[in-house]
Every structure is written in structure tokens, then in C-alpha cells.
């Protein structure tokens, strides 16, 4: 008993394995159940697109079953062609004249239909009997998405069967080694960075159709990045040079056969190239008229972008509040301060990058200085700007690991330029601060521009050199007095004794 079950299981497994293989056929025509007379029409009857009321005597299940499968028809010199086989099972009815099967490509909306008519004597005399119909084959392509429908003739409302069918792709072993589209899709390429071109080698099977190659930018669709090149079947060389202007992660090589609804093969040579990724963050532009900073990536990018500022060289970039944006297409920041410390930070699935567009270019900028004020007991904060601007000052408590805690906000008073001509001399603004507050231990002064949406601060700390008194208890520098005898001999002897040249020595 166990042996019989094992044999039955093995037989079932082997039958299932064989059913996974794509059958090869030599002929594919119409056939009906024995005893029924059928004839076929390839042209679609447009009037069958409109339905009519179903007779009361006709059941909705008059269409019993619809099955679709893929087959291959092979010619030794030309390879194999992909075909779709459709089978239907119906119950005959006196009002039913025939069947219509259609296969529509979901990619191109192209539709193929076949009609099968049953002789009048058959549906009158054999009403209620089951009829099996094998339609003629539909020509399909590798990896094609199809929508298959079955209707009655005439088309009765609510009486229809449909299903989706996916044609096997080149990854299926039998298809990959037998179909010309798959053979031609095995492209070999070399990137010539010096000549900025991609050399493509197209392997050809005997009798295969012409082949197209192009470069495209893979966005929602693959957009042309150059004119397509046609490789003819009888061309002497199957090698093609495709020039490109810029290495980008979304720059792809696309190839397809010169046949309707052919499968397109895409290869993206720079997809994981570090240098190509760096190019994406360099398309930052500043528009002086509107003071707008914009960035538009050449390739689709998923992530966030924000403005940040660097307090000094090598420091981390601190994010500006309310500046984060999701990256969809183009990113814009209006009314941006053109300070060298202002940067853009890009955070994506590939990693993070920082670009400071004003760092190495000459843009309108401003500067803040602190010096003793003519008013007794005060320090004067002065702003110099190459264009009219408004500023404010913060008194901040300096911290070691965090941003300074800024409390007071003071507005600077603008002054016209000395000559009255802003183009000839910079504009000025100033603010006098009480010396006791500004010179307190751990206090920094931050200056901001207030007439723009996004600005970075300038910060000055340790203000003793700006008019604040020195700390009490600090020893004065000692100076070793220079001996009365001067000359190179005495200086050499003094150096050997460790005295130096009489310079100031800090404790």
C-alpha cells in the first residue's frame, strides 16, 4: 500500500514538473468537440463590443471555463516564436451563435480577436450539450502582460469570462535559449570614459530581425538621451558606439528587436558608480534676481534635502529650522542669504552629501565686527553689507556640546553708505551693547540677517580683544631683558644657554 502511494506521488510530481515546461507545437488551428461543425474568423466584429439583454432561458454560467497557456513554434533556422493558446468550454443554447476570444496587451492596448461560429444545426439539435473549443494561436512576445476575454456571439450582458496571462520571460531557461529576442538581449558593453562613449556588441542569431539600441534616462519612463541606432541583420559589424554627455546613475542602455511589441532590455552601467552619484548633487543654482536657491536632480532621487550651516571649517553642518523638503523633482528655497557657511544637505538611501554653493564663489555677502563704542560703557556691533539689508543681534550663552542658548534679540539700526551710493561703498548698520552684558563670561554675540527667509549667523566669542577688559588675576607676560651688548656672538651664546633671543615668554 505504501509503495503504491509512493508511486502515485512520484507520478504526480513528474507530471507537474513536465507541465511547467513550455510545449513546442508545429500547428495551431481551430478545433471543436467531435460532432460539432465550427468555422473561424480572424477579424473582430465591432458590434459584438455592445451587449444585449440575456434571454431568461440562458444561464450566466453558459460559459463554463476559459484556460490560456503559452506555447512555442520553432523553425531550426529562425528560432522559436511565442504563441498563446486559448481553450473554452460552453453549454450550447439555441440563441447562441458562437464565441469570441480576445487577447489585449496591457502594455500597448493592442488587441487580437478570433471568432468561432457554430453551425445552426448544431446549436438547435444539441442544445444543452457541452462544447469544447480550441482557438487558433495568438502571436505574443516575451514577458508580455495579456488580458484574455471570452464572450458569446451575440454578446449577452453579464455573460463573459476573463483572466490575466503573463508570457514567460527570458529568465525561463527554454525561452532564453530559443527565442531570438532573448538571444539579442544578451548585450556586451564596454565604457570608454576617455571618449565618453559606450561600445555595445549585439550577438545575433541567424534569421533574427534588425535590432535597435539607444541611451536613455530612466525616470518614470526611459527618456531619450540620444538618437536610436538600428543594427541591421546583414550589417558587417555588430558593434555600436553610443556617446554620452554625462555619467549618471539613471543613464541606461536599452535594446529591442525591430518587431511589434518587442521586449526591451535595459542595462544601467553607472547605477552603482560612486562618481556618477556625486554628479547628482552638483546641479545647485542661485538666481540673484529672486535670491532663490534651487536644485533639480538629473535622476530620480528619493530622500530629503535641507539647508544647514557650518560654524567653521571641518565642523558638522547644523540644520536650519523649517528647511527640510521631500525630494520629488525640483527643490527651491526663496530669499536665501548668500553666506559661505550656508550649505545644502542631501539625505538619501545611498547616503548623505553636503554641498556649500557659496563657499568658493564671489556672491554678495556681509560681515560683522565688534569694537569699543563712542558711547561710554558700550561695545558697538557693526554690519558691513554690499547691498541693503536688515540685521538683528542675539546675546548667547556658550555651551560645549550644544548650540549656544540665545535669549535677547536686538535690532540693528541701518545707516546709509558714506557716499550715498550703495554700488560705490558698502552699507552699514550698527548696534551698541552694554559692555557688562557683552563681556560677561561665556557670552557670544550672534548676528543674523532678517530680510531673507533663510540666513546663517556669524558668531563672535572671547571678546577681550574687542574692547572687553582682561580677566583679573591673569599674570602679565614676562620679558627677559636684552643685555646691553648686542651682536651675533652674544645671541649665539645666549641661545646655547637656553635664553633665546630675548623674545616674550608665555607662562
From Swiss-Prot:
GO cellular component: extracellular region
Localisation: Secreted
Coiled coil, from the record: none
Predominant location category: secreted
MF terms (GO), sorted A to Z: interleukin-17 receptor activity
UniProtKB keywords: Secreted, Signal
Span of the signal peptide: 1-21
Keyword Signal annotated: yes
Pfam families per UniProt: IL17_R_N
Domain of life: Eukaryota
PANTHER family registered for this protein in UniProt: INTERLEUKIN-17 RECEPTOR, INTERLEUKIN-17 RECEPTOR E-LIKE-RELATED
Name of the protein this chain belongs to: Interleukin-17 receptor E-like protein
Amino acid at each position: 500500500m505504501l509503495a503504491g502511494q509512493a508511486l502515485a506521488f512520484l507520478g504526480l510530481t513528474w507530471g507537474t514538473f513536465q507541465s511547467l515546461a513550455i510545449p513546442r507545437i508545429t500547428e495551431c488551428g481551430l478545433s471543436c468537440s467531435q460532432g460539432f461543425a465550427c468555422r473561424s474568423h480572424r477579424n473582430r466584429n465591432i458590434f459584438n463590443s455592445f451587449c444585449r439583454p440575456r434571454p431568461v432561458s440562458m444561464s450566466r454560467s453558459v460559459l463554463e471555463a476559459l484556460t490560456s497557456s503559452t506555447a512555442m513554434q520553432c523553425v531550426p533556422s529562425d528560432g522559436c516564436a511565442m504563441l498563446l493558446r486559448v481553450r473554452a468550454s460552453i453549454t450550447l443554447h439555441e440563441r447562441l451563435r458562437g464565441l469570441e476570444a480576445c487577447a489585449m496587451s496591457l502594455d500597448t492596448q493592442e488587441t487580437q480577436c478570433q471568432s468561432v461560429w457554430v453551425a445552426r444545426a448544431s446549436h438547435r439539435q444539441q442544445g444543452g450539450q457541452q462544447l469544447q473549443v480550441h482557438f487558433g494561436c495568438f502571436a505574443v512576445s516575451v514577458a508580455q502582460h495579456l488580458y484574455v476575454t471570452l464572450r458569446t456571439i451575440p454578446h449577452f450582458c453579464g455573460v463573459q469570462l476573463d483572466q490575466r496571462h503573463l508570457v514567460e520571460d527570458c529568465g525561463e531557461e527554454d525561452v532564453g535559449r530559443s527565442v531570438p529576442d532573448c538571444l539579442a538581449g544578451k548585450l556586451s558593453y564596454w565604457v570608454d570614459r576617455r571618449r565618453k562613449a559606450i561600445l555595445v556588441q549585439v550577438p545575433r542569431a541567424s534569421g533574427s530581425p534588425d535590432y535597435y539600441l539607444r541611451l536613455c534616462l530612466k525616470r518614470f519612463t526611459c527618456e531619450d538621451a540620444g538618437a536610436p541606432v538600428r543594427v541591421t541583420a546583414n550589417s558587417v559589424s555588430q558593434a555600436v558606439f553610443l556617446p554620452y554627455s554625462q555619467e549618471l546613475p539613471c543613464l541606461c542602455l536599452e535594446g529591442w528587436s525591430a518587431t511589434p511589441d518587442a521586449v526591451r532590455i535595459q542595462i544601467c552601467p553607472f547605477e552603482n558608480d560612486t562618481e556618477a552619484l556625486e554628479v547628482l548633487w552638483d546641479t545647485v543654482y542661485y538666481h540673484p534676481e529672486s535670491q532663490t536657491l534651487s536644485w533639480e536632480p538629473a535622476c530620480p532621487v528619493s530622500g530629503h534635502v535641507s539647508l544647514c550651516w557650518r560654524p567653521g571649517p571641518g565642523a558638522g553642518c547644523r540644520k536650519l529650522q523649517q528647511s527640510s523638503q521631500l525630494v520629488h523633482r525640483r527643490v527651491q528655497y526663496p530669499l536665501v542669504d548668500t553666506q559661505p557657511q550656508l550649505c545644502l544637505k542631501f539625505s538619501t538611501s545611498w547616503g548623505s552629501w553636503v554641498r556649500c554653493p557659496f563657499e568658493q564663489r564671489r556672491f554678495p555677502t556681509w560681515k560683522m565686527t565688534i569694537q569699543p563704542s563712542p558711547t561710554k560703557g558700550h561695545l558697538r556691533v557693526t554690519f558691513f553689507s554690499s547691498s541693503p539689508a536688515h540685521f538683528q543681534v542675539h546675546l548667547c550663552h556658550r555651551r560645549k556640546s550644544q548650540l549656544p542658548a540665545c535669549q535677547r534679540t536686538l535690532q540693528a539700526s541701518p545707516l546709509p553708505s558714506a557716499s550715498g551710493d550703495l554700488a560705490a561703498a558698502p552699507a552699514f548698520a550698527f548696534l551698541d551693547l552694554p559692555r557688562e552684558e557683552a563681556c560677561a563670561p561665556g557670552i557670544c554675540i550672534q548676528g543674523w540677517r532678517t530680510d531673507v527667509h533663510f540666513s546663517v549667523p556669524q558668531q563672535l566669542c572671547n571678546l577681550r580683544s574687542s574692547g572687553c577688559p582682561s580677566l583679573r588675576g591673569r599674570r602679565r607676560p614676562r620679558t627677559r631683558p636684552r643685555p646691553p651688548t648686542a651682536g651675533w656672538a652674544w645671541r649665539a651664546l645666549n641661545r646655547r644657554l637656553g635664553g633665546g633671543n630675548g623674545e616674550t615668554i608665555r607662562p
